[in-house]
Each structure stands twice: as structure tokens, then as C-alpha cells.
Amino acid sequence: RDFDPNNPKDIAKLNTEVIISRYAEQCSNSDISFEADIRANTLEYLPAQDFTSIFCNLLDNAIDASLSCDEPYIDCNVSLIRGGNTGLISIANSCKSSPLGHDGKLHSRKKDTGFHGYGLKSVKRIADKYNGLSIMFTGGKAGIPRCGYAGASLENFPA
């Protein structure tokens, strides 16, 4: 079957391939291990602007955090859970230290904090729009911190 520019599934697949390819290349150029596992039929109903905002903001942050690590990596996974009506978008990456302060809130370690934080606010706004969750977690074993994001319910995506 040929690509159909009027088919939302074809558009979603193309958007996915373009964005993931862009970040895979950035990671390769920066010696960051990059893994992506995006299951079929998981993102076609997410509008392109929302998909792009979620992935670009999260992957930009993941690259930033991973650059200072001895063994930098990013794992990107998208799958369906709960009988296929809930999407799980998970981005996990290495990080030198937890981005969460003692108060449990994100704190910027960037020198220029003027525009810092808008990306994650955008991700949260999109998750809220679809009755999803935007969850930041940290953890790890063997002294390797791990940061990640998970969220988004597909139940209210436009058909």
C-alpha cells in the first residue's frame, strides 16, 4: 500500500519516523545509546502538533541530561495497555543526578533559566487534555541514576 497523505495512520507513522530518526542521529553524533520501541497503532490518533511537542520536549531534555553521563543512554517506548485504550509513552535516560529537589519538584540546572520549564509544562498540558498523567520518576541501580517520563491516556483522543 502506498502512502496516503489523507490517512491519519500514514501521517502518524511518518511523523514518528521523522522525529525518532532525528533524535537517533543526534544521539549517535553525541555517543548516546538510543533505543526506541514504538508499537504499531499506538499514536495515529494523537494530532501531529501534540505528538511533536511531547516527543521533542522530552527527547531534548533526555539528551541534555545524558550528555554529562559516563554511560549515556535514552530508552523511548510507546505501547498500549489496559485493553488497548491507554497509551504509555515512556522516555527514560541516564542522568548525573536527580532533577528533583528535596521538595520533590523539578529544579533547573541550566545556566539560562529564562525559558526553562516550558517544555515540560507543555507536555503536562497535553497529557491533561487527554485525561492522561505526566509523571516524572527517578531511580536506578548500581549507582546509575535514571530519569523518565510516562503518561497519556488514549481514551479521549480524537478519532
Regions found by a protein language model. Name each.
Residues 73-85:
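Short beta-strand/loop element within the Bergerat-fold HATPase_c
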Residues 87-117:
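Glycine-rich/acidic phosphate-handling loop/turn and adjacent ATP-lid/helix
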Residues 132-133:
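Conserved glycine-rich
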Residues 8, 12, 33-54:
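Conserved short strand/loop->alpha-helix "switch" segment adjacent to the catalytic nucleotide/phosphoryl-transfer site
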Residues 48-72:
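Conserved ATP-binding N-box helix of the HATPase_c
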Residues 10-30:
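Short beta-to-alpha transition helix within the HATPase_c
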Residues 97, 139-147, 153-154:
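Glycine-rich nucleotide-binding loop
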